[in-house]
UniProtKB/Swiss-Prot annotation:
Name the record gives this protein: AMP phosphorylase
PANTHER family linked: THYMIDINE PHOSPHORYLASE (PTHR10515:SF0)
Chain positions recorded as AMP binding sites: 170, 196-201, 205, 266, 290
Keyword Transferase on entry: yes
Lineage per the UniProt record: Archaea, Methanobacteriati, Methanobacteriota, Methanomada group, Methanococci
Top-level taxon: Archaea
EC number annotated for this UniProt entry: 2.4.2.57
Residues at the catalytic site: 258
GO molecular function: 1,4-alpha-oligoglucan phosphorylase activity; AMP binding; pentosyltransferase activity
Length: 505
């Protein structure tokens, strides 16, 4: 047992941790990464030991701000460290690593210990990896989904018909929700949209919307905003909706994986938590996204529909083209600009963005009774073209605490590099993967001003020296790294009509 004085450390390690001087660990049974119980007069919290020679002095224990708040420990207060019991879920994680099926108790225990921070990031990574490699059956996924939802807040609505649109993501520039949600809300459809931050893409819906307004809303704020406007665009993590999901996402993000069991559970847990009774799931299909072909897409769609039936949620899925970025803007600020431009002047907006936003909104307009079957997309266009969607979008921004902006008022990264066409020819490929990696290298999504603006899309003719795309960053160093990466991976490929000359057999 160790008795040490608490010292505040302004650091976020993504898990509960305590930082102990090497001298205090010598001759004890405590080692780095050991799990300990930190006790004070006000309570206790579990954390993992990290050792240091300089960050804290002998006799001190560095504690992260979240831990201090959890147990109301004051700086300088003496705390007691003792070995904590191994989490109950460790053998269950090993069981899944061996490819075995988990029972409901085992799944619920894993999720509960994720939320209570009893699992370290290493242990959580092992669980995520096990589901990525070995998968889960539908009973396991259903149980995991329900438990993820139950660990957080649950929102209920007075109206019986509450709908939602959700994309599984993977497509750079996938900003359709900033058009579809205000279209639906303007038609009187109740659609409380909560989104994750980016996992595998350079910007999630919440990241883009955060450029324009506050997205960290509490339950009562969401209810008030939806009652006033019919819709919202909020970050699910701000509402304490399915908190286990956000913890899992933080482990998935560094390695850019989104295991299908977690994907299904993440999407549907948020629907349970927000009281959604009907949802349309967008499944982008194409090179460089999560789903490579229509057969895979149809298989995933059937899983969503089956899971929805087990959870009493009506699910309809649509397969959409995901072979290149949606629109021309990739990155939070650039996407926010493009969305507002599309709301202001839809006739001159990228056709891919308009078509996707209208198609998805049209389905829910028909479901909600605002349009006859087969007439939803037409009504969606009328709402968009008339300016009603822009008006509703600005109302949502205002109600969420922001101030509506003109596109040109949204700041972009001050460090800019234009990438030009090396030859005359045609754009034959735009790699989603390469675009995503370059934009992330430029700093997105954390740097909201970072991104790429495409000048041309697949099939467009270009001449040598034409600008193919522009990279933006808020950091000169990050821009240099992004440009160097772009020159290695060629996100936009230009080829002439002559592919290869062959003169010998």
């Amino acid at each position: 047992m160790l008795f040490l004085n608490a010292k505040f450390i302004d650091l976020d390690l993504g898990e509960n941790a305590v930082i102990v001087n090497d001298e205090d660990l010598k001759g004890t049974s405590y080692y780095p990464q050991d799990r300990v119980l930190i006790e004070s007069h006000a309570g206790a919290v579990i954390g993992n030991i990290y050792s240091t020679k300089t960050m804290v002095k002998k006799g001190e224990v560095g504690m992260l701000v979240k831990e201090l708040k959890e147990v109301s420990i004051s700086e300088g207060e003496e705390v007691k460290l003792r070995h904590a019991e191994k989490p109950e879920s460790i053998p269950f994680i090993k069981k899944k690593m061996d490819g075995q099926v988990l029972n409901p108790h085992e799944i619920r225990t894993i999720i509960d210990e994720i939320v209570s921070k009893k699992l370290s990031n290493i242990e959580l990574s092992a669980f995520v990896s096990s589901t990525y490699i070995n998968g889960m059956n539908m009973d396991e996924i259903s149980e995991m989904t329900k438990r993820i939802a139950e660990t957080g807040d649950m929102i209920s609505w007075e109206k019986s018909l509450v709908v939602d649109i959700h994309s599984i993501g993977g497509v750079p520039g996938n900003k359709y929700a900033l058009l579809s949600i205000p279209i639906l809300a303007a038609a009187g459809i109740t659609i409380p949209k909560t989104s994750s931050r980016a996992i595998t893409s350079p910007a999630g819906t919440a990241d883009v919307m955060e450029v324009l307004t506050n997205v960290e809303l509490k339950e009562e704020e969401i209810k008030r905003i939806v009652k006033t406007t019919n819709g919202c665009l909020a970050w699910g993590g701000g509402v304490n909706l399915a908190p286990a999901d956000d913890i899992i996402i933080n482990v998935e993000r560094p390695v850019s994986i989104d295991p299908q069991p977690q994907l299904l559970a993440s999407v549907m847990a948020k629907k349970i938590a927000t009281g959604i009774k009907y949802t349309v799931i967008d499944i982008p299909v194409g090179k460089g996204v999560k789903i490579k072909n229509e057969a895979e897409g149809a298989k995933l769609a059937r899983k969503f529909i089956e899971l929805g039936e087990l959870l009493n949620i009506k699910v309809e899925c649509v397969l959409t083209y995901g072979g290149q970025p949606l629109g021309r803007a990739i990155g939070p600020a650039l996407e926010a600009r493009e969305a507002i431009e599309a709301l202001q002047d839809p006739k001159n907006a990228p056709k891919s963005l308009i078509e996707k936003a209208l198609s998805l909104a049209g389905i829910l307009l028909e479901l909600g009774g605002a349009a006859q079957i087969g007439e939803g997309q037409k009504l969606a266009w009328e709402i968009l073209e008339s300016g009603r969607a822009l008006e509703k979008f600005n109302q949502i921004i205002t109600e969420q605490g922001g101030t509506p902006k003109k596109p040109e008022e949204i700041e972009l990264g001050e460090y800019v590099e234009e990438i030009i066409a090396p030859i005359d020819g045609y754009i034959t490929d735009i790699s989603n993967t390469a675009i995503t990696n370059v934009v992330k290298e430029a700093g997105a999504p954390r740097d909201k001003k970072a991104g790429i603006l495409l000048n041309s899309k697949i099939g467009n003719q270009v001449k040598q020296g034409d600008i193919l795309y522009t990279i933006y960053s808020g950091s000169e160093e990050r821009l240099v790294s992004a440009v160097n990466l772009a020159r290695r991976v060629y996100p936009v490929k230009v080829e002439g009509m002559l592919i290869e000359r062959i003169s010998k057999f």
